[in-house]
Regions:
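A generic structural signal for nonpolar/aromatic side chains embedded in well-ordered alpha-helices
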Residues: 11-12, 57, 101, 143
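Secondary-structure transition/turn motif
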Residues: 48-51, 145-147
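Charged, gly/pro-rich active-site loop segments
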Residues: 74-152
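Short beta-strand segments
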Residues: 15-49, 55-57, 64-69, 77-80
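Extreme N-terminal tail/first-helix region
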Residues: 1-17
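Amphipathic alpha-helical interface surfaces
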Residues: 8, 53, 93-97
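Short, intrinsically disordered, mixed-charge
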Residues: 58-63, 103, 107
Length: 152
């Protein structure tokens, strides 16, 4: 993924939740927090095909994504990525996204310790994912960046 500066790339790398702004048919913005991964010079955000974010991306692909350096909570800088998005439901994209997300969120020492400390919540997490899957299929919002901005 190409960013304007090393700082922009670092914030994108350490960000945990992206906030995607999509537009309704009346051009009203909606903001949705979603887990994400940088994949093939794009931002991929994982969700379900029934969500408002996906419906709005399908109607109007213009999006902005905000990412903050969450590992440094006192750092006020935010990266805004503007671009066009598409909704992907193909198996290849899903598998690649799951791999990137597992490496980013689950398969690091800090997260492994956290998962073990909260093992009693695994059933609850599994039920949440089953309920979401019952409503629709997994979907990736793939954002092709056109502009990066470092906001103070």
């Amino acid at each position: 993924m190409q960013g304007d500066t090393v700082v922009v790339q670092a914030i994108i790398h350490e960000g945990r939740v992206a906030r995607i702004a999509t537009l309704s048919q009346q051009a009203h913005p909606s903001i949705t927090p979603i887990y994400f991964a940088a994949v093939r010079r794009q931002l991929w955000l994982g969700t379900s095909d029934w969500t408002l974010a996906v419906r709005q991306v399908r109607a109007d692909p213009r999006v902005s994504v905000l990412i903050a350096p969450e590992l440094r909570p006192h750092d006020p800088r935010i990266v805004r990525v503007s671009g066009h998005a598409s909704a992907r439901t193909d198996t290849q994209a899903q598998m690649l996204y799951v791999l990137h997300v597992a490496l980013k969120y689950s398969l690091n020492p800090g997260q492994l310790r956290n998962t073990l400390a909260h093992a009693h919540l695994i059933r609850l997490r599994r039920r949440y994912h089953q309920q979401s899957a019952a409503k629709g299929s997994m979907c990736i919002i793939a954002v092709v960046p056109e502009r990066f901005e470092l906001l103070p």
